[in-house]
């Protein structure tokens, strides 16, 4: 009788592992990857907020799309799809500033980290909210998303 329960437990464990259920080590890895992503997003927000009023007002005219509901790592695909427009906006405003290299480094870091975190799932399609957001709102919302995911892993 106990043998059947034991075998059922093993089968369930194998099914979870095979379907990429989070394990303790993957949770730690995810947390380690989320930290630099969060720092890079915060850096970009700080850079955006440091612009002169004229540049910031111009940057705020560009609109970005946010997913309707971002609650899982797979939703990072939506961030990835908006990285190119974000980089273009930041480059426009930074054209004569020495921080351009730092911004490019942060954008590259974000791109690599998001690719690692979201995994190889290619079938996910983002469902975007109808309303667009400014660059400041965009960065704030993704920072909040990362903090939320991070807090669920603790």
Curated annotation (Swiss-Prot):
Residues 1-20 form the signal peptide. Pfam families: IL2. Glycans are attached at residues 23, 111. Keywords: Adaptive immunity, Cytokine, Disulfide bond, Glycoprotein, Growth factor, Immunity, Secreted, Signal. Its main location: secreted. The keyword Endoplasmic reticulum does not apply. One of its GO terms (biological process) is adaptive immune response. It is found in: Secreted. GO terms for cellular component: extracellular space. GO terms for molecular function: cytokine activity; growth factor activity; interleukin-2 receptor binding. SMART domains: IL2. Disulfide bonds join 78-126. Belongs to the IL-2 family. Cytokine produced by activated CD4-positive helper T-cells and to a lesser extend activated CD8-positive T-cells and natural killer (NK) cells that plays pivotal roles in the immune response and tolerance. Binds to a receptor complex composed of either the high-affinity trimeric IL-2R (IL2RA/CD25, IL2RB/CD122 and IL2RG/CD132) or the low-affinity dimeric IL-2R (IL2RB and IL2RG). Interaction with the receptor leads to oligomerization and conformation changes in the IL-2R subunits resulting in downstream signaling starting with phosphorylation of JAK1 and JAK3. This is Interleukin-2.
């Amino acid at each position: 009788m106990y043998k059947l329960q034991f075998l059922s437990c093993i089968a369930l464990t194998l099914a979870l592992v095979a379907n990429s259920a989070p394990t303790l080590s993957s949770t730690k890895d995810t947390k380690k990857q989320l930290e630099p992503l969060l720092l890079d997003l915060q850096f970009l927000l700080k850079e955006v907020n440091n612009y002169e009023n004229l540049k910031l007002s111009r940057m705020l005219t560009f609109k970005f799309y946010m997913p309707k509901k971002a609650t899982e790592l797979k939703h990072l695909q939506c961030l990835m799809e908006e990285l190119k427009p974000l980089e273009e906006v930041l480059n426009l405003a930074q054209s004569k500033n020495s921080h351009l290299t730092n911004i490019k480094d942060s954008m590259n870091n974000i791109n690599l980290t998001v690719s690692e975190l979201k995994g190889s799932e290619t079938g996910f399609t983002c469902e975007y909210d109808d309303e667009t957001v400014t660059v400041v709102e965009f960065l704030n919302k993704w920072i909040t998303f990362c903090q939320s995911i991070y807090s669920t892993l603790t």
